[in-house]
């Protein structure tokens, strides 16, 4: 499997491509990383150095890949945080080019906008770009509850409401939706859930909630789920594998006392997930 991953990159820490590439490689995926920023560290520190890569330069790299005759081999286009509308246009164009070369390829979009605690932390034009131009061309999207609510104009607070919101999101274009960090009022205390929905049904998986949020964990989640789903075509299996790996990664990071994801130290949990969590069919 080959994945074209168009995301940010940092020297210190693990977000964007710096989070997604290594776990994908450890499960046997050939990754073509195209970076959209080159920063010293992620912006959660409040200070960073480096530069945005212009949409023109990102587009140029993709054209170079196309000129090498590689696009017919691409199985998945993956994108995450988008810093401006120009990058969004480049990603949509890349998806069009890849699908023209390989009609079986899919596009997996992590529509990064914010979360319930922090609100929206991207430029004001980005949510509209994602909703109106990017998500409609995606085959898979991986929003959290907050992002799902914005995309669909709903408040998905209960499981039933979340499923209804997912139906609205799927009507926009993407056949498969992974809702990360689902927090419904009636869930078991001390847990968090992920919900995967495709044309075959809907499944939810519950894991212990760790008192720790590591930047980049969502990027790993989107990457692993997209790869597992492309490989198996089974949303429940992809959900179980992803939940197992990501939980163990976050738990190891939490136990280490480090701020950044212990991505390398946890490498075996990607290649050999424990499969300690079972997905429950909810529809």
Q: For each predicted feature, which ranges?
A:
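Conserved N-terminal subdomain of the carbohydrate kinase-like
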Residues: 2-116, 266-272, 278-283
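Short, small-residue-enriched loops and turns at beta-alpha junctions
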Residues: 84-85, 115-120, 181-186, 211-215
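Short, solvent-exposed loop/turn segments at secondary-structure boundaries
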Residues: 15-16, 46-47, 118-123, 152-157, ...
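Charged C-terminal helix
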Residues: 236-283
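Short, small-residue alpha-helix embedded
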Residues: 149-150, 212-235, 239
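Generic secondary-structure signature for well-ordered alpha-helical cores
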Residues: 29, 63-71, 96, 100, ...
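Conserved phosphate/ATP/ADP-binding segment of small-molecule kinases
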Residues: 120-202, 231-236
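Short pre-catalytic strand/loop immediately N-terminal to key active-site residues, enriched for Gly-Thr
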Residues: 11, 202-216
């Amino acid at each position: 499997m080959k994945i074209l991953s168009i995301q940010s990159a940092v020297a210190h820490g693990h977000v964007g491509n710096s989070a997604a590439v290594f776990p994908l490689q450890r499960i046997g995926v050939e990754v073509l990383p195209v970076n959209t920023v080159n920063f010293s560290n992620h912006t959660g520190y409040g200070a960073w150095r480096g530069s945005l890569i212009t949409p023109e330069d990102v587009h140029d790299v993709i054209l170079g890949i196309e000129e090498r005759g590689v696009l017919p081999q691409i199985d998945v286009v993956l994108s995450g945080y988008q810093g401006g509308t120009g990058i969004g246009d480049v990603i949509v164009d890349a998806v069009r080019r890849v699908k023209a070369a390989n009609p079986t390829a899919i596009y997996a979009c992590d529509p990064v906008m914010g979360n319930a605690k922090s609100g929206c932390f991207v430029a004001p034009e980005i949510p509209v770009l994602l909703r109106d131009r990017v998500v409609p061309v995606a085959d898979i999207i991986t929003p959290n509850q907050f992002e799902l609510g914005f995309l669909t104009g709903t408040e998905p607070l209960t499981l039933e409401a979340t499923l209804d919101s997912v139906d609205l999101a799927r009507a926009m274009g993407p056949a498969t939706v992974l809702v990360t960090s689902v927090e419904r009022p009636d869930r078991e205390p001390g847990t968090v859930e992920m919900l995967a929905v495709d044309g075959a049904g809907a499944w939810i998986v519950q894991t212990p909630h760790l008192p720790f949020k590591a930047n980049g964990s969502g990027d790993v989640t989107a990457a692993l789920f997209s790869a597992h789903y492309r490989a198996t075509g089974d949303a429940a299996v992809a959900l179980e594998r992803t939940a197992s790996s990501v939980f163990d990664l976050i738990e190891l990071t939490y136990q280490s006392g480090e701020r950044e994801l212990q991505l390398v130290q946890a490498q075996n949990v990607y290649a050999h997930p424990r499969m300690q969590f079972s997905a429950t069919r909810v529809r």
